Amino acid sequence: MSNQPTPTLDLPPPPQVAGISLAGTKPYTISADENRALCESIGVAPTADGTAHPIYFYIATQVGMGMTVAGLCSVCEFDVEEGPMMASSKVTFSRPLVTGQPYQITGRIVSLVRKPSRKLGVMDMLEYSLELSLPDGTPMLATTNVWVLPRRRLA
């Protein structure tokens, strides 16, 4: 075994996107019909009290943020057709989501870090945070998502 250092790629820096706002422009409302359909599709009964299924943490924040997935990828100079991959998603609920209630979505891009990958060649790790709140600002949840953006052309 050699004590030679592992060669590193001289990678160009990723786009400077940290701090870009992901605030939504209009409220997102979980309808009772949409919640019922989602619950039925996964084999659970919707609750009688109007509580929405917890997966709406992801649906509501993704749909309600100020960019589409393609737009978010584009800001990172990444073509959505090249296949972004979810690496992780963490959520902290302050209270349960309910149907019929409009929610505001705010958020921002936290970081975009470029690094070598044995499987992908080069990849960017995109981290962004989203918050969902009532119109009066009462927090409902906060989520942090990390996506892998494969940069095959840089490999």
Where are the predicted features?
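HotDog/MaoC-like acyl-thioester-processing domains
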Residues: 2-15, 93-155
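Hot-dog-fold acyl-thioester-processing enzymes
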Residues: 2-88, 154
